[in-house]
Amino acid sequence: MILSFDAKQKLKLSVTRNKDYLSKYLLEEERVVGAMLDSKKLVPEGVGRDKYTVTSFKVFQLDINPVVSIAVENKDGILKMSALDSTLDGLGIIDDFNLILKANLEATNIGLEGEALLGVSVSQPPLLKLVPKKILESTGHSVLNGILLGIKSRVQQQLVKDFLDWCELNKI
């Protein structure tokens, strides 16, 4: 049985100082992604590609450890991130795990705005065969929402600080 669940978050960050330089800052893809995600969990895989180890979590006493290859590009002033490939450690051999990530971030007249969609489809693990599908999907939705909220919180705290550091470094 295939389980599917997703979560979505929007972001609006007010930036008052040097906001005219936000578009240039977003061109620093590696730096921006490092500020948005935990840079210690990012491994560069080439230009515009990183492998990211998502913070592990427990679901029904199972340790879950997603690893995602992420493509990053700045297109028309919008920083876009998407999942290229993903693996799931912690549930034994799962061949049909599919993670969808679509996120964007752009400079606006108020500061930075963006949104992220995170989705998963996976077959029901044998260890969870007795748990009803609705409960598993509801739990999955909550977990994904928690991941996105954690990233959103980090972005709200870290991204503006990193932007101001970047401005200082570039004597803006």
PLM region spans:
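Intrinsically disordered, low-complexity acidic/polar segments
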Residues: 20, 61, 79, 90, ...
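Generic short beta-strand segments
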Residues: 48-57, 82-87, 117-121
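Beta-strand/loop substructures that line and gate deep hydrophobic ligand-binding cavities in soluble
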Residues: 91-141
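A general secondary-structure signal for short beta-strands and their flanking turns/coil
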Residues: 2-8, 47, 65, 96-98, ...
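Hydrophobic-ligand binding "helix-grip"
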Residues: 64-111
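Residue-level recognition of well-ordered beta-strand positions that form the cores
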Residues: 8-14, 53, 69-73, 100-106, ...
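Hydrophobic ligand-binding cavity/cleft-lining segments
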Residues: 1-60
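A conserved amphipathic terminal alpha-helix motif
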Residues: 129-172
